UniProtKB/Swiss-Prot annotation:
InterPro entries: Ribosomal_bL33, Ribosomal_bL33_CS, Ribosomal_bL33_sf, Ribosomal_zn-bd
Recorded superkingdom: Bacteria
Keyword Nucleotide-binding included in the entry's annotation: no
Name by which UniProt lists this protein: Large ribosomal subunit protein bL33
Molecular function terms, GO-annotated: structural constituent of ribosome
Gene: rpmG
Species the sequence originates in: Clostridium botulinum (strain Hall / ATCC 3502 / NCTC 13319 / Type A)
Keywords linked to the UniProt accession: Ribonucleoprotein, Ribosomal protein
One GO cellular component term: ribonucleoprotein complex
GO annotation (BP), single: translation
Classification of source organism: Bacteria, Bacillati, Bacillota, Clostridia, Eubacteriales
Cell membrane listed as a keyword: no
Length: 49
C-alpha cells in the first residue's frame, strides 16, 4: 500500500517535500539527500508524521 509522506530538512526542520512510499518495501522512515530551498544547500531530509 502506497502512502503519502512529508520530508523535513534535518538542519532547518522545515517541511519541503511530499512524496509517496510503499510501506511494504520501506517499513522504516525514509531519509534522502535533497536540496533545501531555505538552507540553500543539499541536506538530509527525513520522513515526518
Amino acid at each position: 500500500m502506497r502512502v503519502k509522506v512529508t520530508l523535513a530538512c534535518t538542519e532547518c526542520k522545515r517541511r519541503n517535500y511530499n512524496t509517496m512510499k510503499n510501506k511494504k518495501n520501506d517499513p522504516d522512515r525514509l531519509e534522502m539527500n535533497k536540496y533545501c530551498p531555505h538552507c540553500h544547500k543539499h541536506a538530509a531530509h527525513k520522513e515526518t508524521k
